[in-house]
Amino acid sequence: MTLDISREEFVEHAKADRPVVVRTAAELDVDVEPLTAYAALTGRTSDVAANDYTFLLESAEKVASSDPDGAFAPETDDRHARFSFVGYDPRAVVTVTGDESEVEAFDDRYADLVTTDGGDVVDDLRAAMPDVALRNFPAMDRQHLEGGLVGFLSYDAVYDLWLDEVGLDRPDSRFPDAQFVLTTSTVRFDHVEDTVSLVFTPVVRQGEDAGERYGELVAEAERVEAVLSDLSPLSTGGFRREDEVAGPRDEYEDAVERAKEYVLSGDIYQGVISRTRELYGDVDPLGFYEALRAVNPSPYMYLLGYDDLTIVGASPETLVSVAGDHVVSNPIAGTCPRGNSPVEDRRLAGEMLADGKERAEHTMLVDLARNDVRRVAEAGSVRVPEFMNVLKYSHVQHIESTVTGRLAEDKDAFDAARATFPAGTLSGAPKIRAMEIIDELERSPRGPYGGGVGYFDWDGDTDFAIVIRSATVEDEGDRDRITVQAGAGIVADSDPESEYVETEQKMDGVLTALEEIEGEPVDVAERAAGHEEVTR
């Protein structure tokens, strides 16, 4: 096994008067799909000792399509879809809940490097990224993950970031405000070059034997290549439903009416009110993800297995992206169903674009995104290069715009994340008052829904999806709790019944994925053996 730089070059790069991240990589001689690799490296289909914190990030890129049976295709020469990433062995995990933060180091060499700040949740995440020099990072023409912090930011972080200022306390929640792993070894799939690489970004400290560390990386690359060689086709499990709980329809429609009253009184222009469906039973998260990817391929596909919590998602919407000094936000607002034929599909899209309510709401949220980006951008650099495009997904069509700016010299990716969080399309306008009303009207804390899943890269880049079209799976010991959530933007002329139907449409993709695997044995060994009865 050889890495892309020699031992001597690695040692030379590691010479510095401060800790250094030396980037190196090994191309693996394997023929394996990302989900199959994830299953093997997390101990699902191998004897690997699995870490409790793992991730799979994939994408199916946006394409213009009027085909109601397939709005997306794996066009791999665009921004999102070229790469897939598997993280399997992090150095540490950072968990932030309210005013409390915790770092668990899995490698003693990182125990005093990964810290928290004691400020707000974004300050804690910035502090958790070790202060290092970077060596041997290649120039890339596109954004990609080279190691760093990977995880999720719950919507409920708004209490720490914004709502403390107006006297609202964080409610008790089953979820942390943020949970991120520090990853220094990432399996990268390049779907254009058709290669699989193991990318290393270890922190090498002063006085450390860099040559010995290089030898560890070579051994790890050999181990991973062996694990990923000659794997059998992946067999995933299914879903057994025991119970389902959904909030009463009239309760949601009453909340919509109350939100409309706030709009009419001038408190807000728009507010996003969401509702949940909770399903109980047993589910295989890998089977769930596999089905969701088939049913609803999207720009952001993610499977985060973080201890007893799994987040499975197919999000269409960028919260914020920073590549170099280029900041991007992609507000999506405006929804209609897919048609049963190309003609009906186009008709529905045309009606959506002609709807004055949809256009006004979308324009307002684009203005909100411009204001968010402007907070971290150089003066005069904010642009809207794409306005009111129609994007087609498996169950719905959306109106999307793109807002860009040039990152100011005194700002970084963490500042950009704070400035744009939460997305206006998941809160409302003006944001603070809309979030106060959400706190009043929604039945329970949102958790990851409406927050973000993504990463802060070593080199200062970031890419976050808004957590929508997603589900959380909580392992409660004797059963799993699966939570699906969706919201609708409420304005002065909103119809409560129509807004309820919109939330149902937005949940359809995730619920259809569960239905696709329902009845299949949850236990993979049983399924492979052909047993009909499910045991856990």
UniProtKB/Swiss-Prot annotation:
Keyword list, A-Z: Amino-acid biosynthesis, Aromatic amino acid biosynthesis, Lyase, Magnesium, Metal-binding, Tryptophan biosynthesis
Pathway info: Amino-acid biosynthesis; L-tryptophan biosynthesis; L-tryptophan from chorismate: step 1/5
Gene Ontology MF terms in the entry: anthranilate synthase activity; metal ion binding
Binding residue positions for L-tryptophan: S59, P299, Y300, M301
Top-rank lineage group of the source organism: Archaea
Needed co-factor(s): Mg(2+)
Catalyzed chemical reaction(s): chorismate + L-glutamine = anthranilate + pyruvate + L-glutamate + H(+)
Residues that hold Mg(2+) according to the record: E361, E502
Signal peptide: none
Binding site for chorismate: G334, T335, Y449, R469, G487, A488, G489
Assembly description: Tetramer of two components I and two components II.
Family affiliation: Belongs to the anthranilate synthase component I family.
Protein name as it appears in the record: Anthranilate synthase component 1 2
